[in-house]
Swiss-Prot record:
It comes from Gibberella zeae (strain ATCC MYA-4620 / CBS 123657 / FGSC 9075 / NRRL 31084 / PH-1) (Wheat head blight fungus). This is Dol-P-Glc:Glc(2)Man(9)GlcNAc(2)-PP-Dol alpha-1,2-glucosyltransferase. The lineage of its organism: Eukaryota, Fungi, Dikarya, Ascomycota, Pezizomycotina. Belongs to the ALG10 glucosyltransferase family. Its main location: endoplasmic reticulum. GO terms for cellular component: endoplasmic reticulum membrane. Glycans are attached at N173, N411.
Amino acid sequence: MGSSSPAQTSNWYELFTGNWLSRPIRAVLVGALALPFVIWPRNQPQNSNPRLLAFFVYLLHLASIPWLYLVTKLVPEPYLDEIFHIPQAQKYCQGRFLEWDDKITTPPGLYLVSLITPGVVQRNGYLDYACSVQNLRAFNVFALAVLAYLALQCRREIEARLYEARFSTRLSNTSQYAVHTAFNIAFFPLLFFFSGLYYTDVASTAAVLVAFLNHLKRIGRDQNSVLSDLVTISLGVFTLFFRQTNVFWVVVFMGGLEAVHAVKTLRPERVDQPVILTLSEQLKHYAWRCSLGDVHDPPLHAMWPDDMIFCVLSLGIAALCNPIRVIRQIWPYITTLLLFGSFVAWNGGVVLGDKSNHVATIHLPQMLYIWPFFAFFSLPLLIPYALPLANALRRLLYMKTSSWSISSSSNKSLSRKSSSKVSNSKGDVAVDAPGSEYPQPSKELQYFEVVFGSKIFLWPLYLLGTIIFSFGIVHYNTIIHPFTLADNRHYMFYVFRYTIRRAAWIRFALVIPYTVARWMTWGTMAGCSQWFMTMHGPACSAYSKGDGKSPFLNHPAFTNRGASPQQTDAAPPAEVKDLDANQQQELSQALKKDPLLASVEPATTSTGLIFLLATTLSLMTAPLVEPRYFIIPWVMWRLLVPAWKFHDHDSEGVAATLERHPKTKPLLLFLQRYDLRLILETFWFIVINAVTGYIFLTKPYVWKAEDGTVLDGGRLQRFMW
């Protein structure tokens, strides 16, 4: 074995000592790494996983610092969009705030926050400042560490809000799932890659997470102070300084969720459903209950196509009937929207600088492309979809049963259920049984119950409708931006080249992968979903909590025929109360026994629909398909994904097999206490980051014309996202 050369030894010394960065920047990076421990609440419960937090903090340090070092050494000059961002930031460093490069179309938030970071600005004279390329890039490493901490706090608050909505008790625990999820978000290939370059994406995402964290704290209270409202406006405007499309995430997503929160805090008294015989009276009763705040908003794992319709309808009625309460909650977001509108009017358009190449165009295929994007990067999260297939293969191999028996038993079970009742999203809608003492409802009401209560009827129609709509989008609205065709430095160039540009029929054939990817990503956000019909049964975490019904169920197809006078026996969430010492001790013991106890709760239907609306609005006006545009939608989706235990979706399959063998039983116990997908997701991201980083750093090339003439002055080109 040969020894390392002095030059190699020097390089490694520079890497780990940080001498290649200015002293203030080194101090900032160390401060960023220490940030979680400095801000970490001192009164955290014992099961708040500080060791796991420390492990991921230093894992992020060991990944991001060498990445920045390698980029600085091998790509010392500004590359691609950096040739616009870095000179503009350097102008700001010199105090030339009125000079602007018209080729830059995004606001100056990145340049402004870079100025207030110690070490980025180095004083060379009385009023002369200079920002070096490496120090400006180092700011994004700092921003990535801040983003990881914000993601941790956001996931913690999401779990707390969902737990409080179910049990009306305050949750102060920081779960292992929240810690690992946050740092997987920081390792997300697009965020990690651009943390080594001076791009706006990392800082913009962190800014949105600041506003999102503030929003999550606001919905933890019934009422908010004027100071909280002013802070919300300030944070909303702050996000707009990084990217204009952030307005959709602040105003539509967060504002929409707060409008739903305002309606749900009405807390109407629970009443029995009267015996109603006509459709008109049934709809009147439904509208009256909605106006009081008795809305229909089941958890995502229990959502069916009709639930989406009645969720929107019930929330709309409740908001229209309680406008003052809703406006009092969302006026900060309305103000943010008005301020943004004033800027657009003053600027003469949404984008800054050159508007010719950034003309807003309706581009709905973006909402088809995003699902394969999610599915590819979150491939390990789709493991639950493989277990039913694995079980079917296992049964086939051992000749115990066939895969057809699963389908037939499921159909028989559903037939028996539908013959006696029509199930709604979280309750059972009783239909007249023979010999019932109740009078017969009208034919219109019976038809209404069958159409909107039968999931077997609605689900195929919904699936067929989405497929037809997708074909229409592909046929009438496929747009290929000139930048996509002209720039072979981006991976998207090759994706388009070998898929939708290869042949017209491929565009239409891809509708099936789009649909499957959408189904899987929505099912992942739903947790243990009913799309698996009876294959999960009571083993699903979301069903094994005892009181499995949501308090927000008001389906108009529910009628009282004597079986049950109410759709749900769950009480509406009361004001959240702090636990006393004994209750806190009991909760801590429960969380110690089951670390995923508070992490398996899925978001509500309204949250999923508002997320879909915000994603659509933020993408549909962009003619250019750019993976960086999908970063914030992915981050928000990833934060909403609940935890998964290995036995979920798998009551009688692989998990049961592992439990029967003494050698594999400890492994099963671990997988029921820790989400296996997180570990696989970490390794998946490491592989993607290693491959794309290696290609970017070591596979440069020179642009040449068809006749061999060197283009772009012979500058090296590199592959990137």
